[in-house]
């Protein structure tokens, strides 16, 4: 509606990220998948979004179902060209134990060492066009997260899991009493309870939005998730006493496009790809 506040946009999201970086000493930036969405992604087979992520200096991407919207090969090309790790601990080439991409990575900044694992859930796998991923196996993520945690624990201070799982569904529906159509993060709660040693789960796919970090009652794992579509920036600050997390602060920051000044570098990239797409459409 005219006059209503405006939310979202990559250049405005980047501006908000830069504001956080200016205020905080040590910042890591993650995405839990489905970056390959929207017209620019569709007409460039994800290239435009990968370029913008590099400009915004992401530290890691967990694989989502939309990363396979153009098949395996375009995504593989994207993985090889980006400067950040793309993670999928439970995606294998069919009938082998060869990973499609990296299972995890170790990031170090200002003396803080993070182990970051990425997984995609079987619900998310089910919405990928089968012919596009017929050469891949998507396996139960829990054993592979457990394996990653066991390998990373002696090497890092914090373990983060980027998840793309759970059910998506309309936020309001005539059948909203039915659990299968609700957006929720039950799969993340299940994972947090099944694997000891996960400090943070950065969740995607369901776009449920968790306004304040959920704390697992058994393991203490923090679970965070935005509403997706670049309308919020998830902010989580961890406080340490030695190597132990003692407390945290977390919330969703709204990306007000009528209040933020767009990041000129990202804006320039968007303009370049819009011109490129207009040329493609005009042919």
Where are these regions (language model features)?
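Acidic, metal/ion-coordinating pockets
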Residues: 1-265
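Active-site nucleophile-His-acid catalytic modules used for acyl/amide transfer and hydrolysis
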Residues: 266-283
């Amino acid at each position: 509606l005219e006059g209503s506040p405006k939310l979202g946009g990559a250049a405005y999201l980047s501006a908000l990220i830069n504001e956080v970086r200016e205020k905080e000493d040590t910042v890591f930036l993650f995405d839990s998948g489905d970056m390959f969405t929207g017209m620019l992604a569709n007409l460039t087979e994800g290239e435009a979004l990968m370029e913008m992520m590099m400009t915004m200096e992401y530290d890691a991407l967990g694989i989502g179902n939309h990363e396979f919207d153009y098949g395996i090969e375009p995504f593989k090309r994207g993985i090889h060209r980006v400067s950040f790790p793309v993670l999928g601990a439970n995606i294998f080439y069919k009938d082998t134990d060869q990973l499609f991409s990296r299972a995890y990575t170790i990031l170090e900044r200002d003396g803080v060492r993070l182990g970051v694992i990425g997984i995609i859930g079987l619900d998310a796998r089910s919405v990928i066009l089968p012919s596009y991923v017929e050469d891949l196996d998507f396996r139960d993520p829990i054993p592979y997260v457990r394996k990653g945690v066991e390998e990373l624990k002696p090497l890092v201070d914090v373990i983060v899991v980027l998840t793309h799982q759970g059910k998506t569904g309309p936020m309001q529906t005539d059948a909203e009493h039915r659990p299968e159509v609700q957006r929720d993060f039950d799969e993340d709660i299940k994972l947090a309870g099944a694997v000891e040693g996960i400090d943070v789960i950065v969740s995607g796919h369901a776009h449920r939005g968790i306004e304040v970090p959920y704390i697992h009652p058994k393991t203490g794992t923090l679970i965070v998730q935005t509403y997706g579509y670049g309308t919020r920036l998830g902010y989580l600050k961890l406080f340490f006493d030695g190597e132990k997390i003692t407390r945290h602060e977390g919330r969703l920051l709204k990306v007000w496009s009528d209040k933020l000044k767009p990041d000129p570098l990202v804006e320039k990239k968007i303009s370049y790809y819009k011109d490129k797409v207009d040329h493609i459409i005009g042919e």
